[in-house]
Amino acid sequence: MSLPEKAFPVSWDQFHRDARALSWRLSGANKGQWKAIVCITRGGLVPAAIIARELGIRVIETVCVASYHDYTSQGQLQVLKEITPALLADDGAGVLIIDDLTDTGKTAGIVRAMMPKAHFATVYAKPKGRPLVDTFVTEVSQDTWIYFPWDMGFTYQKPIADDHAG
């Protein structure tokens, strides 16, 4: 599979640094008193683990909203797993929602409607989804495809000189 013209491949090291940077930003929010993390699966699982460790949060819940069905474009949104009712009390006040990325904002909108008082944080944000997120680390253009490390494998890369031989 070739990368699109605007590709943003993220290594494990880079993602870990970015998730820790998000943790640092979140450490000052809500006076550091989070009741729980609700991570949006599957993309929110990895950053949620890092953030939970960094902020000392023990309660981690998931909500599953499927949108990328073929890894190339967003399909119809479907909630596959709901949030535990106890965390929905008080509209999610004191709860931290974590995802890897907000793209169009459709997934974020569904989860935000479930927990309007929760604090929504993503590692990466695109312009259409950015208004739904309270905290993020890096903004990328809407037409950039982010390749996360858990979606990639190691493959041989031709030397640049091979394409520029005179």
Curated annotation (Swiss-Prot):
GO terms of molecular function: guanine phosphoribosyltransferase activity; hypoxanthine phosphoribosyltransferase activity; magnesium ion binding; xanthine phosphoribosyltransferase activity
Cofactor: Mg(2+)
Keyword presence, Cell membrane: yes
Binding site residues for GMP: D103, T104, G105, K106, T107, W145, I146
Cellular component, GO annotation: plasma membrane
Known pathway: Purine metabolism; GMP biosynthesis via salvage pathway; GMP from guanine: step 1/1; Purine metabolism; XMP biosynthesis via salvage pathway; XMP from xanthine: step 1/1
Main location class: membrane
One Gene Ontology term from the biological process aspect of the record: GMP salvage
EC number annotated for this UniProt entry: 2.4.2.-, 2.4.2.22
Cystine pairs: none
Keyword Zinc: no
Top class in the EC scheme: transferase
Residue numbers binding guanine: D103, I146
Positions contributing to Mg(2+) binding: D100
Membrane topology recorded in Swiss-Prot or TrEMBL: Peripheral membrane protein
Assigned keywords, A-Z: Cell inner membrane, Cell membrane, Glycosyltransferase, Magnesium, Membrane, Metal-binding, Purine salvage, Transferase
Subcellular localization: Cell inner membrane
Residues reported in the UniProt entry to bind xanthine: D103, I146
Binding site for 5-phospho-alpha-D-ribose 1-diphosphate: R42, G43, D99, D100, L101, T102, D103, T104, G105, K106, T107
Quaternary structure, from the entry: Homotetramer.
HAMAP family: XGPRT
Family matches, as PANTHER family: XANTHINE PHOSPHORIBOSYLTRANSFERASE, XANTHINE-GUANINE PHOSPHORIBOSYLTRANSFERASE
Functional summary from the UniProt entry: Purine salvage pathway enzyme that catalyzes the transfer of the ribosyl-5-phosphate group from 5-phospho-alpha-D-ribose 1-diphosphate (PRPP) to the N9 position of the 6-oxopurines guanine and xanthine to form the corresponding ribonucleotides GMP (guanosine 5'-monophosphate) and XMP (xanthosine 5'-monophosphate), with the release of PPi. To a lesser extent, also acts on hypoxanthine.
Family: Belongs to the purine/pyrimidine phosphoribosyltransferase family. XGPT subfamily.
Record protein name field: Xanthine-guanine phosphoribosyltransferase
